[in-house]
């Protein structure tokens, strides 16, 4: 590995803007804002969506398009409910 070409890896706190949930993880991002987390001071990265607020992970998914496709298939092939 070449020396001096890799970005610095550090621990940062990711905060979900929608829910306020905080996650500690490693990153090469260098934010200017800091936050106290579990007694330590870490750089803070604000994110709009995380696993705490994304519909796939919260179980609040909507399958609106799938219903339309099924109805179209049933109409095309004459299947009834």
From Swiss-Prot:
Signal sequence: where?
none
Record's GO cellular component terms: ribonucleoprotein complex; ribosome
Which SUPFAM superfamilies is this protein grouped with?
A: L28p-like
The UniProt entry, under NCBIfam families, shows: L31, PRK01678.1
State the disulfide connectivity.
none
Q: Which GO terms describe its biological process?
A: translation
Q: Which UniProt keywords apply?
A: Ribonucleoprotein, Ribosomal protein
Its name, as the record gives it, is Large ribosomal subunit protein bL31B
Pfam families noted in UniProt: Ribosomal_L31
- The record lists the organism as Lactobacillus helveticus (strain DPC 4571)
A GO MF term: structural constituent of ribosome
Q: Which domain of life is it from?
A: Bacteria
Family membership, please give it: Belongs to the bacterial ribosomal protein bL31 family. Type B subfamily.
Quaternary form? Part of the 50S ribosomal subunit.
| Gene3D superfamilies on file | Ribosomal protein L31
């Amino acid at each position: 590995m070449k020396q001096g070409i890799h970005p610095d890896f550090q621990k940062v706190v990711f905060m979900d803007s929608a829910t306020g949930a905080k996650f500690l993880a490693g990153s090469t991002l260098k934010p200017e804002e800091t936050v106290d987390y579990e007694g330590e001071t870490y750089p803070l990265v604000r994110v709009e969506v995380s696993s705490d607020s994304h519909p796939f992970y919260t179980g609040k998914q909507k399958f609106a398009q799938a219903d339309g496709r099924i109805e179209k298939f049933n109409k095309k092939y004459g299947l009834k409910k």
